[in-house]
From Swiss-Prot:
It comes from Yersinia pestis bv. Antiqua (strain Antiqua). The keyword ATP-binding does not apply. This is 5'-methylthioadenosine/S-adenosylhomocysteine nucleosidase. It comes from the Bacteria. Keywords: Amino-acid biosynthesis, Hydrolase, Methionine biosynthesis. Belongs to the PNP/UDP phosphorylase family. MtnN subfamily. Pathway: Amino-acid biosynthesis; L-methionine biosynthesis via salvage pathway; S-methyl-5-thio-alpha-D-ribose 1-phosphate from S-methyl-5'-thioadenosine (hydrolase route): step 1/2. PANTHER family: 5'-METHYLTHIOADENOSINE/S-ADENOSYLHOMOCYSTEINE NUCLEOSIDASE (PTHR46832), 5'-METHYLTHIOADENOSINE_S-ADENOSYLHOMOCYSTEINE NUCLEOSIDASE (PTHR46832:SF1). Homodimer.
């Protein structure tokens, strides 16, 4: 088994990359892919860059060059669920774009033309993540994660997103693009992110302060998931 792991930023991948054994690096089109073994599993760790285009391009390179059996998107997210606080975990049941709008042609908010309204995470991977959450005794929510090419900071975008997606648990900038590409490649995926900020008017300040906390928590989750997969054989 080979596991693809995707993080957007240096802070989101460095703790994992430093632990990869027999590490090799592929640099292509602004992305870096690190291959080797981590916690007993063959891995391909992608640092994609920030935003939907970077995430889609990097995920495509990862799937084409490394052909992982599954993909886990790690990193940080802004919490919209009222129960979430910094360091808590959000696990995707589905991902959607919050900044796509072709509703004039009969599509749902966030739905791209010719595509599903949502990209649904793999149930077995969700169960794996939630099992690890229980083992680690972390606070977590399973729910909708919405993505767009904007850092959500202020009342107006929050109001718009919550109105269009009432069940949204968290927002960030890559997950829906990753889910979109995995859907096209028929590759199972799940998003497991740690909350770095609560999406309010001061979210940019808390993001800068707590990104390291979120990176440590999401890394803890990835390592636990890999260990469980290795034990299953």
């Amino acid at each position: 088994m080979k596991v693809g792991i995707i993080g957007a930023m240096e802070e989101e991948v460095t703790l994992l990359r430093d632990r990869i054994e027999n590490r090799q690096t592929l640099a292509r089109a602004g992305c870096e892919i690190y291959t080797g073994q981590l916690n007993g599993i063959d891995v391909a760790l992608l640092k994609s860059g920030i935003g939907k285009v970077a995430a889609a391009m990097g995920t495509t390179l990862l799937l084409e060059h490394c052909q992982p059996d599954l993909v886990i998107n790690t990193g940080s997210a802004g919490g919209l669920d009222s129960s979430l606080k910094v360091g808590d975990i959000v696990v995707s049941n589905e991902v959607r774009y919050h900044d796509a709008d072709v509703t004039a042609f009969g599509y749902e908010p966030g739905q791209m033309a010719g595509c599903p309204a949502a990209f649904v995470a793999d149930e077995d991977l969700i169960a794996l993540a939630e099992n690890c959450i229980q083992q680690l005794k972390l606070n977590a929510v399973r729910g909708l994660i919405c993505s767009g090419d904007a850092f959500i900071n202020g009342a107006e975008p929050l109001t718009r997103i919550r109105a269009a997606f009432p069940t949204v648990a968290a927002v960030e900038m890559e997950a829906a693009a990753i889910g979109h590409v995995c859907y096209l490649f028929n590759t199972p995926f799940v998003v497991v992110r740690a909350i770095s900020d609560v999406a309010d008017q001061a979210s940019h300040l808390s993001f800068e302060e707590f990104l390291v906390v979120a990176a440590k928590q999401s890394t803890l989750m990835i390592k636990a998931m890999l260990t469980t997969l290795a034990q299953r054989g």
